[in-house]
Amino acid sequence: MNQSMGKFFSAAIGATVGAVLLGLASCTSIPPSKPVSWSKPEVLVAPSSFSGVHGLAIDQKGRLLAGSVVGYELWEVNRTTGSARVMIPAPEGQADDIAVGSKEELAWTNYLMGMVRYRENDSAPMKVLAKDLPGLNSLDFDRRNGKLYASQVFLGDAIWELDVSGAKPPRLVAKDVGGFNGFEVGPDGMLYGPLWFKGQVVKIDPSNGAVTVINSQFQTPAAANLDGKGNLWVIDTKTGELSKVELANGRKTVMKQLKTAIDNLAIAPDGTIYVSNMADNGIDAYNPATGEVRNLTSGKLAVPAGLRYADGSLYVADIFAFRKVDANSGAVTDLARMQASDMEYPFGVGISKSRITLTSWFTGTLQVIDRATMKTDTMVHGFKAPMDSIPMDDGSVLVIEIATGNLLRVSGAGFKEQKVVAAGLAGPVQMTMGSDGAVYVTEAAGKLTRVNLTDGSKTAIAEGLLLPEGVAQTPWGSFIVAETAAKRLVEIDANGSKRTIAENLPIGLPAGPGMPPPFVATGVAVDPKGVIYFSADRNNAIYRITPQR
C-alpha cells in the first residue's frame, strides 16, 4: 500500500467511524444535565392590560371605562393612545358592566360577588346597592329620573330596579326572560337589549316587565346600545358581527365583521362605537360614518393559566380562549374562543399524543378533544371544581378536584366511570406525570406530593411551599414549581431540597371573595432541553427561562 492509498483509507475509516458515532448519538439521546444557574425570565408573549375585558362606558368627563371580572378591576382607557390604568382596584372594582348617570354617578356589577356598587362621583365613598344576587351582569340608569336597573344572567335570570339611596330593597321587574345582557335605558324609559339565550333584541317595559321583540336574527347577542338616531347597535359574540337594527321596523344590517368573543359596547358623544373583546383584552373603535375600525388596545392572550409543552409548542388554557404558542418565536394561534366554540372557560390543560383535555373549576367541566381534528370528543359536567387533568395512554383521564381533594381516574363511555385514585389532597391545584410513572401534585396547603397510581399512596416531596400551583418535571428529574404567594419559581429535587430559579414575578393573581385560593393557576412547562416556560396571570404574559451550563 502506498502512502497516498494509506491516507485515503485512513480518511475513509475516520469518516465511517464519525458517521457511526453521530448515528449512535442521535439514537441514544442523553438528557441534559442540571444547570449551574438560570437566565433571567425573557418575554415570549407580551403582557397586556386587563384580565379579560367586558363592560364599557363613556362617563361625563369623556373617559372610556372598562371592566374586568377575573381581574376584579375597573380601568380607565385613553381614547387616543389606548393606554390603560386601574381606576378602581380589586376587589371592589370587579365590573362586568358599568353605568354612568346624568351627573357623575357611577355604578357597576360585581358579577362573581352578586353585588352592585355605586358612587356619586370620583371622590365620594362607594356603597353597595344590591347583594346576594348571583350573576348580576348588566345595568344602566334612566337618565330622566336617576332610576337604576340591573339584570342577572347565567347565574340567575331576572331584571331588578335598584334604589340608589339604598333605603329600599331591589324591586323585581321580570324574571326568566332569557338572559337580558348588555342593555341600555332609552329616552322613553324602556329597557333595550339582547336576550342571550333566545337570539333576540327586545324592548322591556320596566313598569310591568312586558317584553316586545324587535329582532330575532341573532345567534348570541351580547349587548346593545342606542345611537339617538333611531338605531340599536348590537354585537353578536358568537359571530363577531356588529349590527345596526332600525327601531322603526326591526331591520337588521351587519355593519362590521369583528372577532368573535366580543362582549360589550359603548357609544361616545361623537358617534364612535367602542367594542370590547374578552378573548383578546381588546377594545376596538368603530367609526360608523366611514366604517373604519381602529384597535385601541389588545393582547395576544387573555388570562393565561394552565400550560403544557408538546412538539415545540405551548398549549395554553387562556380562560376566554384556548391557544397554541410557538415556543421559539412566541407566535400565538387561536384554537378556540369563548362563545364561538363549545369551550367552557378553561383554567387547566392536559395533553397526550392523541388527545387534549381542558378543565374548568368555574363550570365543573372536563372537555376531551381529539388532537388530530381539534374537535370535542366528550364534554363531561358535574365535577367538583376540577383544576387540572392528564389524558392517559389507556384512554382514561386523571382529574384533580379542589373541592373534594380527590385525584380521580375517569373512563368508559362518556367518561362517566369515576374511581378515586387518592383522597385527602389539601387543595390540589396542578399536576404532572413523573418519569417514574407516578403523578406529582401541588397542594394549595403548601405541598408537592407524589401519588402512586397503583395503590394511591401519597408521599410528600416538599412542604412549607407558599401556595404552589404550576408544576413540571425537568429532563434531569427535578420539579419546577410556581410558588405564587412568594411570586417565585423554585426547583425541587426528589429529596425535597430546593433552590430559587426566579423571583419577583408577575404571578399570583389574588382570588376574590368566595373563590378558591389558586383562582387562576400559574402554569409551568419544561421542554426536552430543560427550558422553563410559565404563564403570568398578573400581566397576561408568558415567559421563558433558559438553563445556563
Sequence positions of predicted segments:
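Blade-level signature of beta-propeller repeat domains, shared across WD40, Kelch, NHL, RCC1
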Residues: 517-549
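Short loop/turn segments that connect beta-strands within beta-propeller blades
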Residues: 78-82, 119-124, 162-168, 204-209, ...
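A short helix->beta-strand "capping" segment at the edge of beta-propeller domains
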Residues: 31-51
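A short beta-strand motif characteristic of beta-propeller blades
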Residues: 40-47, 83-89, 124-130, 168-174, ...
